[in-house]
Amino acid sequence: MTTIVSVRRNGQVVIGGDGQATMGNTVMKGNVRKVRRLYNDKVIAGFAGGTADAFTLFELFERKLELHQGHLTKAAVELAKDWRTDRMLRKLEALLAVADETTSLIITGNGDVVQPENDLIAIGSGGPYAQAAARAMLENTDLSAREIAEKALNIAGDICIYTNHNVNFEEISSKE
């Protein structure tokens, strides 16, 4: 598994993820890039789950974004519909955290598209640890979205054996 966290604060949204890929109880690779920019760098996305499955979903999601001229929610709903109803796609095991300058969403294989409370997303095996840490920082500090995401991933990496400290981030600032 992994940890992906998305934090939105003061006109900035950040998605960060660790780099560990495991097979069973063995670390296969420590520098997987699980966070990407999509649709002309206007959308950022991170995945938790099977790497090959996630790359397939990134490609499909980017096609949906192009089809719907970058409308994040519409593209997410259409991907979730296909993911749930297509026999081959149904077998893909991953979660996606996606964001543009105004909206953050979680997309699942059961057809769910969820806009989380407080625009805070944390998915993967270390998600609960990262979410608790990020929520505490959002409510009690003036740290930036990037600083909160970094610290939340660091805490998750200290606790979750399927999360490492080799993290990467993508961020978007609103034009306000």
UniProtKB/Swiss-Prot annotation:
Pfam families assigned: Proteasome
Entry keyword Hydrolase: yes
Keyword Hydrolase: yes
UniProt subcellular location: Cytoplasm
Entry-linked PANTHER family: ATP-DEPENDENT PROTEASE SUBUNIT HSLV, METALLOPROTEASE TLDD
Domain of life of the organism encoding this protein: Bacteria
Mechanisms controlling activity: Allosterically activated by HslU binding.
Function field: Protease subunit of a proteasome-like degradation complex believed to be a general protein degrading machinery.
SUPFAM superfamilies per UniProt: N-terminal nucleophile aminohydrolases (Ntn hydrolases)
Oligomer and partners: A double ring-shaped homohexamer of HslV is capped on each side by a ring-shaped HslU homohexamer. The assembly of the HslU/HslV complex is dependent on binding of ATP.
Gene Ontology molecular-function annotations: metal ion binding; threonine-type endopeptidase activity
HAMAP family (alphabetical): HslV
Swiss-Prot/TrEMBL keywords: Allosteric enzyme, Cytoplasm, Hydrolase, Metal-binding, Protease, Sodium, Stress response, Threonine protease
GO BP of this protein: proteolysis involved in protein catabolic process
Catalytic activity: ATP-dependent cleavage of peptide bonds with broad specificity
Record-given protein name: ATP-dependent protease subunit HslV
Residue numbers annotated as active site: 2
Transmembrane segments: none
Entry GO CC: HslUV protease complex; proteasome core complex
Family: Belongs to the peptidase T1B family. HslV subfamily.
Assigned EC number: 3.4.25.2
Sites where the protein binds Na(+): 157, 160, 163
